[in-house]
Amino acid sequence: MTYVAAENRYEKMIYNRCGRSGLKLPAISLGLWHNFGDDTPHRTKQAIVRKAFDLGITHFDLANNYGPPPGSAETPFGEILRTDFSAYRDELIISTKAGYEMWAGPYGEWGGRKYMLASLDQSLKRMGLDYVDIFYSHRFDPDTPLEETMGALDHAVRSGKALYAGISSYNSQRTREAADILRQLGTPCVIHQPSYSMLNRWVEEDGLLDTLEGLGVGSIVFSPLAQGMLTDKYLGGIPDGSRASQGKSLKTAFINDRTIANIKALNAIAGKRGQTLAQMALAWVLRRGRVTSALIGASRPEQVEDCVGALKVLDFSDAELAEIDTYARESDINLWAASAERKGPPRK
């Protein structure tokens, strides 16, 4: 059956300007980091993307290595674009990234020009696109001059293969350096994608949000639900089949007694607000208008709908924020900390 987008898709979504650019993003965007690889049925992927767009989510975030296995998220997304969304391409913001390992040898990861541009070409081929709207440096490269990495982003934009340049997981200092280089090249840094949640507050401690505001750069935060920890999934411990039980990016050590107690307390606060824990967690990262968009992941269309429901109650009282701060504690779950520093892992 031919897909026809909901006529009212723009009525309830909020769209925020990305820094000082002309780009607007939905307050909730869909990320395809997990749940879009070969281990997920195509019909499920298709249903998730359709539901997202019907709810006004116009931004779909990918990377070269998303899967599993790496690269396998972009291919089915491209197929969905061809079968369902060819008539809506001009209504979509599609992003991809390069930085993590994709192929063997010395040119298969990090931030060198050869890798970055080859990776972009591969992503475009997998998705069947002529261009992406945003192309990111996925992580800071401690061994490649930042001028080279930013030069690759600049080239991608000037060649018409990307409309905007962005960076991900860079700390404040590296962000300022990257933005300065891009500004001199004439291709501004439009967006930064850091991790941020109630349990991962490094962007506050680092001053990154202040830096972005000063630079006029937008922000789209990933893992605002702490890989599912800020949902009802782990309130009773680690369930079978969950990401933590599989020992993947969410490690079982993260789900300790202290963290579960804090999550339960946050869930109670959400209940008093008439929200699910996930909805409150999303509203919290969007508070005060400092974050342009929150990236969600979903394994079912219903999860997308629940997350978009967060936009119904975005305001917090001072008392609520103070109570949340009692339990929204840094939980050492920032897996991407090394991506922001020169002290990154050594090359193989």
Regions found by a protein language model. Name each.
Residues 19-37, 95-108, 131, 136:
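N-terminal small/glycine-rich loop or linker at the start of catalytic domains
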Residues 40-44, 72, 76, 107-115, ...:
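Alpha-helix N-cap and loop-to-helix initiation/capping positions
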Residues 30, 62, 96, 134-137, ...:
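Conserved beta-strand positions
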Residues 3-7, 12, 141-328, 343-348:
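Beta/alpha (TIM)-barrel catalytic core signal, keyed to glycine-rich beta->alpha loops juxtaposed to Asp/Glu
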Residues 26-27, 61, 87-92, 130-134, ...:
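Short acidic capping loops at alpha-helix termini that bridge into adjacent secondary structure
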Residues 39-53, 111-127, 175-179:
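Short, acidic/polar
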Residues 124-144:
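Active-site groove signature of glycoside hydrolases
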Residues 1-92, 158:
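N-terminal binding-site loop/beta-alpha segment at the start of enzyme catalytic domains
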